[in-house]
Amino acid sequence: VWWSGLSVTEAKQGIYLIGSELTEEQWKGQTWYLHESGRTRGSIKGHIRFLPPYDELLLGYKDRTDVLPSEHYSKAFTRNGLFFPVILYEGQIVGNWDRKVKRNGCGPGCSLFRQESRIDEALLDKAQQQYMQFLGK
């Protein structure tokens, strides 16, 4: 919980306060508390997002293998704590993105971790447009 700025006591109190809204699940020997608004089961097909550096999806967990195979750790973050912007596709980190200057403006450049990764170009374009809209471009 260190990344949240909360103490362990405060985090436990928060879980207690909204406990009736949480579902407890056991997975791979760990207890997970899920809020109904954050559930993704059945809804991540085709879902793509450009996540910023230091996003809590990677920063918030010691074991990141559920969303990122360990062989790609060095592409998402360094040993000394530098995190890179990543592409989340269908619940998995599949690549990096960065802001590149183009003749017709700014747009993110993408690099997938595995050549065989297939992402529908229309989905990738939509994610890029959402990013540009967020920047006000």
Predicted regions and their residues:
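Long, charged, low-complexity, helical-prone intrinsically disordered regions
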Residues: V1-K137
